[in-house]
């Protein structure tokens, strides 16, 4: 008996094999595989599987993070601290912009904005009351442990 493919598996396979520039393009590719879905649902699935939009030869495209990318982020983040309204992430020199881009893509519904220098990122949450939860989301996305 053939195993039924889930939409998560189909989406991961599309991203692995061909990628996509837009969520609408992903909707069309999923529809071609028999999954009728909406852009907002695709957006949620992309967050769930931690897909990010990366620049490449064919322009910016959605992609799955590799296991080495997750391992790399763990070694690039030196600390994550916060006050009542702002999260500050210290990184090794030269990596703040790359990590800020991961945060912007992976947590765009929780983050109002990021500002990255060479080794420091300021993260402003959409809702200050949810700042502790955002700290956990950031730690999970970057595969780091909080102090």
Curated annotation (Swiss-Prot):
GO BP, one annotated term: negative regulation of DNA-templated transcription
Keywords of this entry: Amino-acid biosynthesis, Arginine biosynthesis, Cytoplasm, DNA-binding, Repressor, Transcription, Transcription regulation
Organism: Chlamydia pneumoniae
NCBIfam families referenced in this protein's UniProt entry, alphabetically: argR_whole
A Gene Ontology cellular-component term: cytoplasm
UniProt function note: Regulates arginine biosynthesis genes.
Protein name: Arginine repressor
UniProt record similarity statement: Belongs to the ArgR family.
HAMAP family the UniProt entry points to: Arg_repressor
Domain of life: Bacteria
Membrane-traversing stretches: none
Listed pathway(s): Amino-acid biosynthesis; L-arginine biosynthesis [regulation]
């Amino acid at each position: 008996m053939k195993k039924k493919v889930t939409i998560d598996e189909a989406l991961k396979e599309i991203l692995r094999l061909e990628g996509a520039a837009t969520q609408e393009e992903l909707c069309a590719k999923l529809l071609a595989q028999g999954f009728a879905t909406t852009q907002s649902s695709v957006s949620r699935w992309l967050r769930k599987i931690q897909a990010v939009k990366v620049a490449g030869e064919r322009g910016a495209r959605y992609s799955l993070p590799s296991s080495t990318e997750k391992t790399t982020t763990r070694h690039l983040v030196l600390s994550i601290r916060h006050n009542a309204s702002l999260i500050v992430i210290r990184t090794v020199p030269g990596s703040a912009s790359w990590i800020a881009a991961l945060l912007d893509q992976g947590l765009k519904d929780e983050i109002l904005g990021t500002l990255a220098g060479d080794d420091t990122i300021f993260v402003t949450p959409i809702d200050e009351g949810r700042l502790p939860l955002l700290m956990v989301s950031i730690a999970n996305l970057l595969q780091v442990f909080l102090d």
